């Protein structure tokens, strides 16, 4: 099985909250697709709550589009990581990490402004596979933690695992 890009970086040295360009690729027509690692908490040290990350999934995707789409950028998808330490965001374009971090902080402020669980988009059995597994208060706790900590940048060249280490694993 091929080694995926996300497993070639040292998770023990990742900062969080932090933005990282996980991958950049070009389509046959010349469009640039960038995948960002939006790391909410430090791997193997903390984890996003099940209900909190699920509610963020519903809110974050729309709020990030509100703040980041435009000027050569269009978000394709934002999905939670299976390890529950963050989200992957795929988009068309190559926005700077600072622009992504600023949009992320603005989206977290938007999460704090949601006043009622009924305002969570697609919160029904027709549009959500586990529509009862949500917590606005847990999502807002996550947002508060991100805002309080601020968002840094993780750089691949600083996190790259050596070939020697990769062969041992």
From Swiss-Prot:
GO terms for molecular function: iron ion binding; S-ribosylhomocysteine lyase activity. Its EC number is 4.4.1.21. GO terms for biological process: quorum sensing. Signal peptide: none annotated. It catalyses: S-(5-deoxy-D-ribos-5-yl)-L-homocysteine = (S)-4,5-dihydroxypentane-2,3-dione + L-homocysteine. InterPro entries: LuxS_sf, Metalloenz_LuxS/M16, S-ribosylhomocysteinase. Gene3D superfamilies: S-ribosylhomocysteinase (LuxS) (3.30.1360.80). Fe cation binds at residues 54, 58, 128. Its cofactor is Fe cation. It comes from the Bacteria. Binds 1 Fe cation per subunit. It is an enzyme of class 4 (lyase). Keywords: Autoinducer synthesis, Iron, Lyase, Metal-binding, Quorum sensing. Belongs to the LuxS family. Involved in the synthesis of autoinducer 2 (AI-2) which is secreted by bacteria and is used to communicate both the cell density and the metabolic potential of the environment. The regulation of gene expression in response to changes in cell density is called quorum sensing. Catalyzes the transformation of S-ribosylhomocysteine (RHC) to homocysteine (HC) and 4,5-dihydroxy-2,3-pentadione (DPD). HAMAP family: LuxS (MF_00091). NCBIfam families: PRK02260.1-2. Homodimer. This is S-ribosylhomocysteine lyase. It comes from Shewanella amazonensis (strain ATCC BAA-1098 / SB2B).
